[in-house]
Amino acid sequence: MTTVTESAVKALLTSETTASLRTRYEGSNICTWIGFKHINYLVEEAILYHFDQSGLAARTLHAEHGLGVDLVDLDTRILTALFMDEVVVAKVVPSAADGDDSISFTVTLHADRDGKDTKAITAKAKAVLRSDNYAEEAGEPPTPIARFVTHRLGTPAPRLPEAPDLSGIVPAADNTSLAAGRGTTGPDPVLDLLTAGKNAFGWKWRIPYPYCHFSERLQMSSYLRQMEEVVDLFLADRGISVKTLLDERRWIPACPHSRIQILDEALMEEELYTIYTVENIFKDFTYTSRMDCYVVRDGKLVQTATGKVTHGYALIENRRDWNLVTFDERVSKALRGEV
């Protein structure tokens, strides 16, 4: 068994790491630009590389010590677009003050722009080590890294409203059948409760195993997928689907900022209730929305994640160039729920 040494943990917490990473082909959905989800994937990949270079690779930690590396907070800003087949340089700076029970990371992605080193992406993240007793008992964690070990995922909750009481409400059980594919947006009594009186959209979906890791739980990258998916469904519900505005105007959603925090665990094959609420529209140029995710457990709503994402719209000028545009009345009304 690999020993978790003091020197390896010191490297994990104090050494900076630099890695060359390549954008993923899958992340290029419109022309050759890379979407926000795959930009976040690069940030995650850089952090995992840092673990590996410190001598504490994620596979080793799990296979030998029953510890799963989990990102529980990921806050990313896109300063300039990344492209298909682009190699970026990731710089990872870790930190952990005395008494911290998570490891913090600052990650920057640098790209070449006309021969100049350009900071394209900045991100802040937190990671913990989740003790895993699924296949066998994990045992006591190695002492040098024990303070970062948790028996359940979660971050200190931001100031969120308390989850509604489900008293008298029986969750629908027949609207996320396998034939339904993407689940349901209603009618559903729990979705109705969570969206009532808000400029919000609700989606209920059965968590499939490809969205999980370490055999049981939803992971950060899958919440990013969830965020991307609920935006797609929301826009279609408001009559301004991605394809509609592409075909009519060559407009595409453009995302400069996203953040997701995991508050509790969501498990494989649970029903996940995702609520997408438009909170602010800034000068008809960008809008910021909140994503809240819940499961129903023992008859109560349990919030498992919260996040925020900002979008604008970009006009595709040609296969290489785009420019941000102001919302017109149709789009503005759709986002405000005035359709």
Stretch-by-stretch model annotation:
Residues 51-104, 237-281, 285, 306:
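Hydrophobic beta-strand-centered segment that forms part of the acyl-chain substrate-binding groove
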Residues 2-71, 126-256, 314-339:
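Hot-dog-fold acyl-thioester-processing enzymes
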Residues 78-89, 93-179, 267-268, 278-339:
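HotDog/MaoC-like acyl-thioester-processing domains
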